[in-house]
């Protein structure tokens, strides 16, 4: 199983940016934690972080050709603005879980709307880095469940 983890703008500044909201743990720590859990579950995980909307769209489109089973995406600020990312996700038709470190529904009014949630199978928010692990497990369970269903 192959899962792509995409992180949007400013997530490379985890541990530096607004630690009262996002904590003091760094982006490198996040990647290490996800890799550890993925390795236990024998899942291949690839990571991508960009501050640029077009590069995120390009990566989503490449995921189609690279045959990823799932995408975990934290679009960060693009959550609330990017129809382009929504359209890219819809076009590749890959199982997608949206993740947010903070609970966007408890933040400023403009952060409460998510375009990505219009496509994502589920949204996990407010659980910190654990949300990524929950997303990983969600995709694993969904894909494995689909395979078992197809085998019957």
Stretches found by the model and what they are:
Residues 55-71:
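Short, electropositive alpha-helical surface patch
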Residues 1-4:
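Extreme N-terminal starter segment of soluble prokaryotic enzymes
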Residues 46-54:
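Short beta->alpha junction loops
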Residues 14-28:
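Glycine- and acidic-residue-enriched helix-capping/strand-helix junction motifs
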């Amino acid at each position: 199983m192959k899962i792509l983890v995409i992180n949007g703008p400013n997530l490379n500044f985890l541990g530096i940016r607004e630690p009262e909201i996002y904590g003091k743990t760094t982006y490198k720590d996040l990647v290490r934690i996800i890799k550890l859990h993925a390795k236990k579950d024998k899942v291949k995980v690839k990571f991508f972080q960009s501050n640029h909307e077009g590069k995120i769209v390009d990566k989503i489109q490449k995921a189609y050709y690279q045959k990823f089973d799932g995408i975990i995406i934290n679009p960060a600020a693009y959550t609330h603005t990017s129809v382009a990312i929504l359209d890219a996700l819809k076009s590749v038709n890959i199982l997608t879980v949206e993740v947010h470190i903070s609970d966007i529904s408890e933040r400023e009014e403009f952060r409460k709307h998510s375009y990505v949630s219009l496509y994502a199978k589920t949204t996990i928010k407010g659980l910190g880095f654990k949300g990524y692990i929950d997303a990983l497990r969600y995709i694993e369970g969904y894909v494995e469940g689909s395979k078992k269903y197809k085998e019957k």
